[in-house]
Amino acid sequence: TLNVEKTLNSLTREMVDIISDQLAHWATNERVVAVLIDGAGEKAFCAGGDVQALRNSSLETPGGPCDYAEHFFAREYRMNYLLHTYAKPLICWGHGVVMGGGLGILAGCRYRVVSERTRIGMPEITIALFPDVGGSWFLNQMQGHIGRFLALTSSHINAADALFCGLGSHFLSNDQKPDLLNRLIEQNWGASAEHNQDVVAVLLNDITPSGALPEAQIAPRLETINAWMSGSDLIEIYERVAAWAGDDTWLSKAQNGLLQGSPLAAAWIFKQLNQSRDASLREVFESELVLGCNIMRHPEFAEGVRALLVDKDRNPVWTYPNLLSVPNDVVDTFFVAPADMPALGLPE
């Protein structure tokens, strides 16, 4: 259980280390047949990483290396990789707010339960970060241009959308959690991880949700989303979104997410997703660490966090006023590994 309710269970470096160590221990403990990951309180599974701590690290050593932030990313991505490659069944109860690093944990689990209270998002463009924690992997798995849309607009989605785009595997009502836990205890577990994966799959498929799915937001708008996000030219995408003049409140929020987000972040998000499309999971996390470390060494991120979470004026002064003024060669520098960055150290 992620247990810092007052911060919506935001991840710190210490929490990442504890989760990683515990998962590694349980992987070889024959008495552990499956792992369920949840969050304390009713509001959130996990609202992401502690971005204020990352900002402080970025400000302490302008230009880098940013010790706390960069080692946080390295450890967090190792944890994400462990989740994705874990042999035993991993069940995530993704209730309430599931953002950023929280979504990374959810996406890494084979069984991803969402409820009527689930609110998922990757709002990184708002603070000049990027959808990391494997986002370059799972956003690229989605049909059409949904992944690109979520990354560039910071749109929030619900349980129906999560099932539609693959972030959720099962829907249960929030009040069914005790029943799920009781049923897990009663199962006929075996000695092999493969058998126990089947046990969990059959169990989850067998439980009927006690409530209704929320109204879908993505599926009925998929045609517009794909039209907005098609093509290989980010400027054209930006101009299409900016020119849209519909009366759909949800799409208007998405439009504002792109138009008000960091232009520099839009550029590196677009490039990272494109160059990761055919990458392996290992290559995804390696490239995300390079980009994450370089972002920490640039002032754009600290300004984004300042405007949203510190001064809360929601009026960031971005390095570049618009996408047209973002030089390609500047964007390219974010994808060159700094010589003094920490090693990712994924297991062979």
Summary of predicted features, one role per range:
Residues S173-L258:
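Amphipathic alpha-helical blocks and their helix-capping loop/short-beta junctions
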Residues G39-R78, A128, F334:
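Glycine- (often His-adjacent) and acidic-residue-rich active-site loop
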Residues L291-N294, P299, E303-E348:
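C-terminal amphipathic alpha-helical interaction region
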Residues G134-N196:
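Contiguous mid-protein beta-loop-alpha structural module that forms a pocket-lining wall or clamp
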Residues T1-D38, Y81, P347-E348:
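Conserved CoA-thioester-binding segment of acyl-CoA-metabolizing enzymes
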Residues I235-G246, W250-M296, E300-A302, R306:
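Substrate-recognition/cap regions that form aromatic- and gly/pro-loop-enriched pockets
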Residues I37, D50, I105-L106, D161-A162, ...:
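Hydrophobic/aromatic residues within transmembrane alpha-helices
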Residues L83-I127, F149-S155, A159, H170:
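Glycine-rich beta-to-alpha active-site loop
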